[in-house]
Amino acid sequence: MEAVISFDFQNCFIFILIFLLTFLCFFFFFKKPKDSRVNFDLPPSPPSLPIIGHVHLLLSTLTHKSLQKLSSRYGPLLYLRIFNVPIILVSSASVAYEIFRTQDVNISSRGVTAVDESLVFGSSSFVTAPYGDYWKFMKKLTVMKLLGPQAQEQSRDIRADDIKRFCRNLLDKARKKESVEIGKEAMNLMNNILCKMSMGRSFSEENGETEKLRGLVTESIGLMKKMFLAVLLRRQLQKLGISLFKKDIMGVSNKFDVLLEKVLVEHREKPEKDQGTVMLDVLLAAYGDENAEYKITKNHIKAFFVDLFIGATDTSVQTIQWTMAEIMNNTHILERMREEIDSVVGKSRLIQETDLPNLPYLHAVIKEALRLHPPGPLLPREFQQGCKIGGFYIPEKTTLLINAYVVMRDPNVWEDPEEFKPERFLASSRSGQEDERREQALKFLPFGSGRRGCPGSNLAYMIVGSAIGMMVQCFDWRIEGEKVNMKEAVKGTILTMAHPLKLTPVTRQPPLTWI
């Protein structure tokens, strides 16, 4: 009898425990948000899996391609859900244009962060900061001083020296008849330029600093997809006392903190005559300004550099790699680029940044590569308030996901959207400034758009333009086989090549005495 009572009690306890857990899961994860379909005319929603909704689509290897198939079947504006978290998916240039034109302020926040205290996209991050006083202050500081025209002019020699160093390295490979992995060479170039522009120094190869930085950037990019899921589910998980992927995120953050703290200490020990010309000096001046519009902290400074290295390094590297891949698969484009550069620059000196405004075809080639291969194929935002888009109601706090990859291949606004045609970006192929403005806002989104568009896009164009221009001007290139394999892969949330681009440089103008 005692055994029976004990058995019944155990069963009862297990039943109650399961019931409570089920109730909690339902309440926190599966309960519909306040703005339900019964009360509002939401966009159409494709069939979803029980409980988890459409989460499986975000877990695919090529998320942008999975979402492209979904939108081609069900429409350009869709309502998705991850458990009970609402998401609006946009896959049309016209819908994207309407949102950026009418809801720019409303979508100027990216939502909550994955882990507040992390330097990697935490609460101190300029990239993930909500649209408020801190973000406005940092945007103004970035546009006016950190990446403004004067700052770019002051740092021009830094970029020119590293482009020359890049060229010398390729020249050495050409003499040895060795192939190079374009992505790795571009990564070295970007790391050197960004370190010198931001901190006035390059990280040392000897003591492993360079490798540490590259490793942290790679690790952070690898975490980005996890961070996106952590952000989506954070509000629900917080109620249960759970922080998704916190250990991984804080592990990378702490390593960045050690590296950047060392940089800050060493910079303070520099003589005053060596200070005042790089981004770190501008940020330290703002940090010490008691009358500043917003009082930033050391964590804000560190987080800015984390944003810079994660946001600018791999995106520019992939742009260089994809652009060279397209050039190699289209030899007539290489010939036209070379003719333009030889005509403007000549054959007695190396291409310079000041030449770039006079090289429209080079610029068009880079833009076309960005159109077909945007580094960040998905652009996340958050609707702060409820609004109407395309005749449908969008509830407040709904995540917005713009599939820039699909928007920039929209056949309704792009002629032959799957073909590599740089000519579409030449001024002669467009009519008037209004068309150009609409093109930028409506169709071309590799750097986002509106208030949250990338403030470093002009700098990226200068570095990528100088690098691509130099490689075209100075070298012929050989590949294994007839064509470059253009198969895509995604690293974190960055669109990259599944097979790294390997080319063999051949000196075009020996002995390149002007290098």
UniProtKB/Swiss-Prot annotation:
Disruption phenotype: No visible phenotype under normal growth conditions, but mutant plants exhibit loss of tropic response to gravity when reoriented relative to the gravity vector in the cold. The keyword Transmembrane applies. It is an enzyme of class 1 (oxidoreductase). Pfam families: p450. Keywords: Heme, Iron, Membrane, Metal-binding, Monooxygenase, Oxidoreductase, Transmembrane, Transmembrane helix. GO terms for cellular component: endomembrane system; membrane. The chain crosses the membrane at residues 9-29. Belongs to the cytochrome P450 family. Plays a role in the gravitropic response of the inflorescence stems and roots. May affect the synthesis of flavonols that have a role in regulating auxin transport. This is Cytochrome P450 705A22. It comes from Arabidopsis thaliana.
